[in-house]
């Protein structure tokens, strides 16, 4: 039996056609720990963070969390957030090594996406598609890794406070964002780090710039997955603009869960897309 597992930054709680499990990450702020599972109220999380003046941060899934997720199956595909900005992939690999000591017959492959959110969703959907074709485990791994090279990520943020506080971007870069409606448009680099590409003022200019960046990155009407942190209007406007260029494009919008809401902050929009 095949099982697909991803950390909670994929923003998925289920996936049609496969056995899927999300392994939660944790957001810590002051005296509160917010476990990023299906019970988390992301609106409450964002409100709490907006009122919180102290330090905050995130924690990757525990070794035990991964080990429990591995149980009950013999073929496992694991999808993680970029290893360049998180210890999640390393914790999954450590758990795999422990699990295989007592379950040597189980096959476990870990995909370090060098990305997050919607690009992880695209990979999950591709794995489900390949599994439905009845392909062998090793072939699925190979084809999925090839597919990952054809997907990309852009995002627009109204604030870089939490990213800067946790060392993901420089505090100098974060300082100018959010002032007078300035948004930052960025991408996931080939190394899985955050690469700013443009500053925009206002939602309309940000949307137009995002569409232009996708087109420049050779987007030709493939799948698009848009995740947002309480900004359905911007997500919808982006989808409508892309449909204006490619009316038949498969575009899906969903809200961010806890981890992506923490780093994208309220108003952030994250876009994963295919260029194949």
Indicate residue ranges for each PLM-predicted region.
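Class I S-adenosyl-L-methionine
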Residues: 32-101
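A structural signal for short coil/turn segments at secondary-structure junctions
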Residues: 73-74, 103, 218, 246
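Acidic side chains
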Residues: 7, 11, 36-37, 74, ...
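Mixed-charge interfacial surface used for oligomerization/domain docking
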Residues: 3, 9-26, 31-32, 85-88, ...
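Generic macromolecular interface patches on structured domains
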Residues: 55, 102-105, 150, 154
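A glycine-rich beta-strand to alpha-helix segment
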Residues: 80, 109-110
């Amino acid at each position: 039996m095949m099982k697909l597992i991803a950390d909670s930054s994929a923003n998925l709680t289920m996936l049609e056609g496969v056995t899927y499990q999300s392994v939660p990450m944790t957001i810590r702020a002051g005296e509160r720990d917010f476990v990023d599972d299906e019970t988390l109220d992301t609106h409450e999380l964002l409100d709490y963070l907006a009122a919180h003046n102290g330090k905050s941060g995130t924690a990757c899934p525990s070794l035990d969390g991964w080990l429990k997720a591995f149980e009950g199956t013999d073929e496992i595909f694991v999808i993680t957030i970029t290893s360049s900005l998180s210890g999640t992939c390393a914790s999954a690999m450590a758990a795999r090594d422990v699990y295989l000591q007592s379950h040597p017959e189980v096959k476990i492959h870990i995909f370090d996406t060098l990305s997050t959110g919607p690009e992880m969703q695209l990979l999950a959907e591709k794995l489900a598609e390949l599994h439905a074709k009845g392909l062998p485990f090793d072939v699925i791994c190979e084809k999925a890794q090839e597919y990952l090279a054809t997907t990309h990520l852009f995002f627009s943020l109204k604030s870089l406070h939490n990213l800067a506080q946790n060392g993901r971007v420089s505090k100098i870069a974060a300082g100018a964002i959010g002032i007078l409606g300035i948004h930052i448009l960025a991408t996931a680099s080939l190394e899985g780090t955050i690469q700013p590409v443009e500053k925009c003022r206002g939602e309309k200019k940000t949307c137009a710039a995002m569409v232009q960046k996708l087109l420049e990155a050779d987007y030709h009407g493939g799948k698009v997955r848009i995740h947002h942190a309480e900004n359905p209007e911007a997500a919808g406007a982006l989808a409508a603009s892309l449909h204006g260029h490619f009316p038949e494009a498969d575009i899906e919008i969903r809200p961010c869960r806890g981890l992506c809401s923490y780093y994208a902050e309220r108003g952030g929009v994250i876009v994963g897309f295919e260029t194949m």
